[in-house]
Amino acid sequence: SEMCIRDSLNPKAVFNDGTPIDIDALKATWQIQRDPDGEYKIAAAGIYEFIESVEAIDGDRYHARVVFKTAHNPVKGLLFGGILHPAMLDVNLFNEGFVDNPHPELGCGPFTLAPNGWNSSEKTFTAVPNDKWWGEKPKLDRIVVREMADAAARAAYKNGELDVVESRTLSAYNEMKDVANSEIRRGRRLFAGGMNLNAEHITDVAVRKAIFLGIDRGALAKIRFQGLPYEEEVPGSMLLLGSSQYYRDNYPARNPEEARKVLEKAGYTKSGDFYAKDGKTITLKLTTFGDDATTKGQAQTFIQSMKEIGINFELDSRAQSEFSKVVGNREYDVSISGFGVTSEPTSAAEYFYHSKNWNGVGTPEIDAMVDEMVTILDDAKRAEKCNEIEKKHMSEVCLFIPFLNGPDFKACRPKLANYGAFLFRSLDWSTVGWMA
């Protein structure tokens, strides 16, 4: 029942402090990420919790044998996609040591942090070519990343202070489409966007199920794309884009009448416009981020659709800069946000639908389905099981509501090469440069 993988490393590869990227780095990567309930603050263990051992082959520090407790598929793209420095085995360093300190010596790649390149007060990060990099020399002399609110970023782009700015919302696209010395580079976004329900706040699954049945996802998507040169079918999956051969629409059909019946069956009674139970009206908050008019329109439409089924929602509008804190600490009832999408559904199905990743919220039956799914070797059969899992979770547990994938529009300087909309191709910063 065991599975063995052999992994080869480039002997030229080193971290920025000169530490070799060898068997010790692979072991550290596994040991840090193998236990989601351990000392290290990780979101999910993923493939690493299924590993039994990581050992050098015949003493060769650049060839490793990875033994799994049971079969796990797929492996490509999930195993050692990012390799951690052995120094990060220090729990305090891993959990707290990167606060206001990027530790460039523990990284690697074609670029590294410039001297004095991290400025937390000005919210800038400046990278320069890395002399420890063993690969192709990068084209750029410097990359400056700045944290800015969306409107401020667009203004800075128009003033010549930035070379790239996101332009995928209607207000952003209209503002940027005719800017001089600029072009909109277009593609499809690898994103499952929608509503995320926090089961720690909305503990009654009947309320979550009513939200799933009552939301008008089509209306929310229409608001998002109205006026944009972009169209798509409303997605019914968090796992894949609709263009995938394995995509299935797993979302339950909208049924406001059934949503009200679900609440009444759970003991809620109508008191005025809203349902209540034990003297408490169902009152929740919808958390949004930023000041985009489209997001505000979506929020109001959602709140109205919830009023139609007897659930009272209030708007909790936060600054864009609060996103990581609020979402990371789960300080919301329902949020408008989303997750990245890949070309393969296994890791997403495991992450979204196994209860271990959501403080036990789920069902033993679904957990068993996920545990079985990751052992299936055949890609098509494994994808079929992923869809079965998602369909069941969306009808019984009700945490993630997809209603858009959306466009990937970026305003870029015309002579900026190898940057823009990539779809499934990873951004290779060493190839980004300026055309003559």
Model-identified regions with their sequence ranges:
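Detector for C-terminal structural segments
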Residues: T124, I215-Y246, T294-I303, S324-A436
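Ligand-site clamp/hinge motif
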Residues: P129-E175, I303, N312-E314, A319-Q320
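A structural "hinge/loop" feature
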Residues: S1, T19, I23, P74-P86, ...
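Ligand/substrate-recognition segments at binding pockets and active sites
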Residues: E122, T269-V341
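Append "and occasionally in soluble cytosolic enzymes with long acidic Gly/Pro-rich linkers
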Residues: V128, T203-Q304, E388
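Surface-exposed binding/hinge segments that line
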Residues: R6-S8, A43-L93
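Gly/Pro-rich hinge or "lid" segments in bacterial periplasmic/extracellular proteins
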Residues: F80-P138, R142, A152, P256-E257, ...
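Short, small-residue-biased leader/transition segments that mark boundaries at the very start
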Residues: M3-I5, A127
